[in-house]
């Protein structure tokens, strides 16, 4: 397929992706799919990783969409240690969330932490770092935290 026959925009998982990028790099435009997962999807489907996304046939694009759906249901052959949602809080299943579903789930997790007044939830409420970083010299924007300056 010549370069002028490349589809400029390809829609996968409700996201418009650049058809001029190589397949794995284009797939990273979908929220929840990083470069490692994109390569895993390509290898699982037997796609040429050097091909541009716009050069793929409609059938190959359909297969990519089906694989992404399988990931979110936990039915893919990709190992579960690569999933972004292992041992889900409600179901206990391993799944890989993408797009709006991922954003919604993360928001629900944070809201749950806030509701039960967990330390992490309180830090989220206050807009402070959650993962134990120091606040004396970092995260100074917006509010006074840490040590006051001597006068």
UniProtKB/Swiss-Prot annotation:
One of the record's GO cellular component terms: cytosol
GO molecular function: rRNA binding; structural constituent of ribosome
Gene3D superfamilies on file: 1.10.8.50, 30s ribosomal protein s13, domain 2
Keyword rRNA-binding on entry: yes
InterPro entries assigned to the protein according to its UniProt record, in alphabetical order: Rbsml_uS13_C, Ribosomal_uS13, Ribosomal_uS13-like_H2TH, Ribosomal_uS13_archaeal, Ribosomal_uS13_CS
Basic residues biased stretches: 133-151
HAMAP family for this protein: Ribosomal_uS13
Assembly and oligomerization: Part of the 30S ribosomal subunit. Forms a loose heterodimer with protein S19. Forms two bridges to the 50S subunit in the 70S ribosome.
The protein's name: Small ribosomal subunit protein uS13
Organism: Methanopyrus kandleri (strain AV19 / DSM 6324 / JCM 9639 / NBRC 100938)
């Amino acid at each position: 397929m010549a370069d002028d026959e490349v589809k400029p925009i390809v829609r996968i998982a409700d996201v418009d992706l650049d058809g001029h990028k190589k397949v794995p790099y284009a797939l990273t435009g979908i929220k929840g799919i990083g470069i490692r997962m994109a390569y895993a999807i390509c290898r699982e489907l037997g796609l040429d990783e050097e091909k541009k996304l716009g050069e793929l046939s409609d059938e190959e694009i359909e297969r990519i969409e089906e694989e992404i759906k399988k990931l979110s249901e936990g039915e893919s052959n990709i190992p579960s240690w690569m999933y972004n949602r292992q041992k889900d809080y409600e179901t206990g299943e391993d799944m890989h969330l993408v797009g709006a579903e991922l954003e919604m789930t993360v928001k629900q997790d944070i809201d749950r932490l806030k509701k039960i007044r967990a330390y992490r939830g309180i830090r989220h409420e206050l807009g402070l770092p959650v993962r134990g970083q120091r606040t004396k010299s970092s995260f100074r924007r917006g509010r006074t935290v840490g040590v006051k300056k001597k006068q």
